[in-house]
Amino acid sequence: MKLPSVASLLIRVYRTTGPVSHIQRIRHGAVLNKNYSSVSAVKNCTALLYRNHGEPSQVVQLESLDLPQVGAECVLVKMLAAPINPSDLNMLQGTYAILPELPAVGGNEGVAQVMEVGDKVKTLKVGDWVIPKDAGIGTWRTAAVLKADDLVTLPKDIPVLSAATLGVNPCTAYRMLTDFEELKAGDTVIQNAANSGVGQAVIQIAAAKGIHTINVIRDRPDLRQLSDRLTAMGATHVITEETLRRPEMKELFKSCPRPKLALNGVGGKSATELLRHLQSGGSLVTYGGMAKQPVTVPVSALIFKDVRVRGFWVTQWKRDNRHDDEALRHMLDELCILIRAGKLSAPICTQVQLQDFRKALENAMKPYVSTKQVFVM
Amino acid sequence: MKLPSVASLLIRVYRTTGPVSHIQRIRHGAVLNKNYSSVSAVKNCTALLYRNHGEPSQVVQLESLDLPQVGAECVLVKMLAAPINPSDLNMLQGTYAILPELPAVGGNEGVAQVMEVGDKVKTLKVGDWVIPKDAGIGTWRTAAVLKADDLVTLPKDIPVLSAATLGVNPCTAYRMLTDFEELKAGDTVIQNAANSGVGQAVIQIAAAKGIHTINVIRDRPDLRQLSDRLTAMGATHVITEETLRRPEMKELFKSCPRPKLALNGVGGKSATELLRHLQSGGSLVTYGGMAKQPVTVPVSALIFKDVRVRGFWVTQWKRDNRHDDEALRHMLDELCILIRAGKLSAPICTQVQLQDFRKALENAMKPYVSTKQVFVM
């Protein structure tokens, strides 16, 4: 599968306004033009480019790229902040389900400020904060010319780190809590990888709705500290993978009902154990596979317990809802209300400069990382 | 889980009409009463009873049981024919999801004729053909007193073997083809265990609707003969498990689209391979686990291909629709139309007498059995 839409649209936009230069080789949102004389105040940008797949910190380079003129339906944006997500790393490694043509700029998420708008743009104005509607923008850069239709505004009264990390993890958490089971206050959700970006958002969004969460994490040196942090966020129970497999789990179900929904970011045994604790007719939704093992489902759970096994990919959801701006708008508004109310915080972040990318990428690859690397431009 | 409804209802009915004798020990539909003087023409029956779980042919015994009086809401029926299904064997072995209290009469499916009706029965009349609405009747017997509400009529113009085998396998096939994906003529369904009772019904019902079927069977001595038989029934393609795993499968998809629906009666590798051939967004529905191995689903199939993994159990469907007679009636009517049109035949059956039960049970346990054992009373 090749990355469609954003990058190819940009190239099409560019082609209508000027001669084709070597931009055709750069498809991943990084549109540059050494031959074109732009009227924009910002004529170039610094970006984290990769020309080959491989070890993330090795294949990425910091480069200066020229920007094209701002076409009638485009905007010039200054990037404010952009995180390193696990899917970005998989893209660099060449193992993700969608891969841009190379060379490409890394990063699929982030918040930017509009600096200049094309003549026909009605939806955005200078100063607006925007995030990409879809993956494929190439967000690890200081500035970009983007099609206005590929962006959606965010209010400027939320923290910049919340804005930069809103479009992937909290949206994934929100949709998984909304689209698979009808959950109401008092219901229970169980999840593994509870310390991931998605996991933390699940805890907070569920808590805001009065939904119990049983949160499974791997045993680790700072277990108590992490457990306390998740509990402070609103987690009902925090348990280790080992506890998940023990008979004493039944004690836990004296204080909350068996879960209707299980969220799986791990796979393997962990997923099978989540399933085991589900209510009859409940759903297991997989959004990640950290353990690199498949999801194994006993036949009896399917036939006699009617468990439903599904997957979720926020990129696909955004594409399926590409022409329904209301659905995306409604979700972002709800999440921003939670952020303003102090009920949904950004994950703990380490802010890094673009030039420190090698260390940031290496840190993002380490196991048991409890902080998200975010480029701040 | 204990068998509810039918048997316990019968006992409740009996209790309103006469003294309680040792019938309380027989909960599995087999209601008998040595102390009661019945006004029915038929006062007792012969039944295949089991008092312990174990090897089917060893634990079953042929016994004579007295029948209770026909209560106001009950009917006396003469059993005409009743098959041995895999789930019946699992019940005898004690490995099924629902198990009756022992002693119990074996068998959960079959067709009977009404011989006498209670005063308050409006839905049935003498001479009607009836089948049970739910599992738990104990059908391997010559006669029974049953609650009218637990029975549904079938037209008498279909073959008795079709009637005796309609309620489980064809109903399972019909619902799986109806409830999980919206299938239209030209779509494809893939299934393993294509030679099972359910598999044969799937082939015929799908063919009647113009739906392609890809039918996977195990390699065996009479492969060609079996393949020809399934093709004559309407199978689009018949392949072996080995072929299912080979690259030449893509040749097959030149003549029919990739399946929206995969039906799994096997589990293990076979189920994973069915999944691999599904369309994006398609469903794998498991109704059996002949291989005694779980269903293993790659994480990427869930996240990036949005495959949906579900289970189906016709007994649960019947219970969920217990108070919606229309749903059951509509399905049976549709199936009877197919039977009359020569589009849905009973599986190849071996008719046996109740007294030959040991040999019948042994035959039903053999692998690669291509004929269903049916008791004819």
Curated annotation (Swiss-Prot), chains A, B:
<keyword id="KW-0496">Mitochondrion</keyword>
<keyword id="KW-0560">Oxidoreductase</keyword>
<dbReference type="GO" id="GO:0006633">
    <property type="term" value="P:fatty acid biosynthetic process"/>
</dbReference>
<comment type="subunit">
    <text>Homodimer.</text>
</comment>
<comment type="similarity">
    <text>Belongs to the zinc-containing alcohol dehydrogenase family. Quinone oxidoreductase subfamily.</text>
</comment>
<dbReference type="GO" id="GO:0006631">
    <property type="term" value="P:fatty acid metabolic process"/>
</dbReference>
<keyword id="KW-0443">Lipid metabolism</keyword>
<keyword id="KW-0275">Fatty acid biosynthesis</keyword>
<keyword id="KW-0521">NADP</keyword>
<dbReference type="Pfam" id="PF00107">
    <property type="entry name" value="ADH_zinc_N"/>
</dbReference>
<feature type="binding site">
    <location>
        <begin position="195"/>
        <end position="198"/>
    </location>
    <ligand>
        <name>NADP(+)</name>
    </ligand>
</feature>
<dbReference type="InterPro" id="IPR036291">
    <property type="entry name" value="NAD(P)-bd_dom_sf"/>
</dbReference>
<comment type="function">
    <text>Catalyzes the NADPH-dependent reduction of trans-2-enoyl thioesters in mitochondrial fatty acid synthesis (fatty acid synthesis type II). Fatty acid chain elongation in mitochondria uses acyl carrier protein (ACP) as an acyl group carrier, but the enzyme accepts both ACP and CoA thioesters as substrates in vitro. May provide the octanoyl chain used for lipoic acid biosynthesis, regulating protein lipoylation and mitochondrial respiratory activity. Involved in iron homeostasis; affecting Fe-S cluster assembly and ceramide metabolism.</text>
</comment>
<dbReference type="InterPro" id="IPR051034">
    <property type="entry name" value="Mito_Enoyl-ACP_Reductase"/>
</dbReference>
<feature type="binding site">
    <location>
        <position position="372"/>
    </location>
    <ligand>
        <name>NADP(+)</name>
    </ligand>
</feature>
<feature type="transit peptide" description="Mitochondrion">
    <location>
        <begin position="1"/>
        <end position="52"/>
    </location>
</feature>
<dbReference type="InterPro" id="IPR011032">
    <property type="entry name" value="GroES-like_sf"/>
</dbReference>
<dbReference type="Pfam" id="PF08240">
    <property type="entry name" value="ADH_N"/>
</dbReference>
<dbReference type="InterPro" id="IPR020843">
    <property type="entry name" value="PKS_ER"/>
</dbReference>
<keyword id="KW-0809">Transit peptide</keyword>
<feature type="binding site">
    <location>
        <begin position="312"/>
        <end position="314"/>
    </location>
    <ligand>
        <name>NADP(+)</name>
    </ligand>
</feature>
<feature type="active site" description="Proton donor">
    <location>
        <position position="96"/>
    </location>
</feature>
<feature type="binding site">
    <location>
        <begin position="218"/>
        <end position="220"/>
    </location>
    <ligand>
        <name>NADP(+)</name>
    </ligand>
</feature>
<keyword id="KW-0444">Lipid biosynthesis</keyword>
<feature type="binding site">
    <location>
        <position position="169"/>
    </location>
    <ligand>
        <name>NADP(+)</name>
    </ligand>
</feature>
<keyword id="KW-0276">Fatty acid metabolism</keyword>
<dbReference type="GO" id="GO:0141148">
    <property type="term" value="F:enoyl-[acyl-carrier-protein] reductase (NADPH) activity"/>
</dbReference>
<protein>
    <recommendedName>
        <fullName>Enoyl-[acyl-carrier-protein] reductase, mitochondrial</fullName>
        <ecNumber>1.3.1.104</ecNumber>
    </recommendedName>
</protein>
<dbReference type="InterPro" id="IPR013149">
    <property type="entry name" value="ADH-like_C"/>
</dbReference>
<dbReference type="GO" id="GO:0005739">
    <property type="term" value="C:mitochondrion"/>
</dbReference>
<dbReference type="InterPro" id="IPR013154">
    <property type="entry name" value="ADH-like_N"/>
</dbReference>
<feature type="binding site">
    <location>
        <begin position="287"/>
        <end position="290"/>
    </location>
    <ligand>
        <name>NADP(+)</name>
    </ligand>
</feature>
